Amino acid sequence: MPFLAPPHLPSSHNKIKQDPKPGPDTGQLASTSDTAGKPLIEMRDIFKVYKTNAGEFTALKGVSADFYPGQFVSIIGKSGSGKSTLLNMITGIDRPSSGKILIGDTYLQGLSESQFSDWRGRNLGIVFQFFQLLPMLSLLENTILPMDFCRMYTPPERETRARDLLELVGLQNFVDKLPTAVSGGQVQCAAIARALANDPPIIVADEPTGNLDSRTADMVLDLIDELVKKGKTVLVVTHDEAVARHASRTLVICDGELVDEDISRILPHISHRSMLMIAHEAIDFTRKPGENIFSDSGEIPGMVLVIEGELDIRNSDGRKTASAKSGSVIHQSYIKKSIIAGKSIVPGTHGAIRLKVISEENLQSIKTQSRSFRAFMEKLEVEEAIYSSAKEEGQA
């Protein structure tokens, strides 16, 4: 092969640093800079298998992810991909078949149902897609309920806080109304107020803007922004592209697997299944400045993704003629054209680079299975160009 062999990559991402002791720590987590640099939520190798009359169905397949304080994370995927199941693992609405979940210093599988219920009430604000409020209680009473359940704040403080939260979502004139007396969008807003009642460090929402008009949805997104600024961690399952664009981080789930975030970031326009196939076949490389990555001997890779750093394309005299920055895609045709012209493709001078490389054989296999990916690659092949915001130096 013309590219150097990849070094051994540590698999620390798939392990929780220390096996946490199962314990009944049901206090409230910190959501401030006290936890800076440390994940607030750690999920490791989560599997969820359901037994049905038709046999076993695996909804989650080895999911591992970290979520940090102050992140607004959107989780997207097709219906049935595992989005809601993933949230249910965090909220305890369902339990994983195997794997570990650590939130703060609390090992969730070590909690009994009653301990989990108390812990959840203090640490998670949950906005469901359906069945939001108790129909026999007013919006005010629904918002007070989590504070009553967890014995947080004094009774007068609970009512004051509930009224303030309902005003925050524009429902100050409807506090005494029953859920059946207001619109679906207003019920959704009241559910958001209720989720914030105990000032939890983590907000989990399943389609929080699904029943809202555009104006109210914008208000909810602004509210989420304010919560994130205060250090809250917000996880949202959504089909709404506006919500996904608003998030600081987007996870794609497909067939129960999380798609590699670098691939979904660089190739957002191809199908989720294509992203997953690329993630399965890609090989990781890390290279230092000065190392020539490709040569004219052996097989040329079908596609290269620049994950971190910058690749320089240089003439034989060392002059840089083009660059491929983080987020770039380089087709085999561009690499061949550069090599034939006597150019070298090397890491930039500012530091090491990280690449994902896919062989020509695997690339062709993916192209035959995905129309959107095939069209994208054919366009790159015809143009013999680098797909990125980087441009040939000197060109407009």
Where are these regions (language model features)?
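Conserved ABC ATPase signature
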Residues: 178-182, 186-188
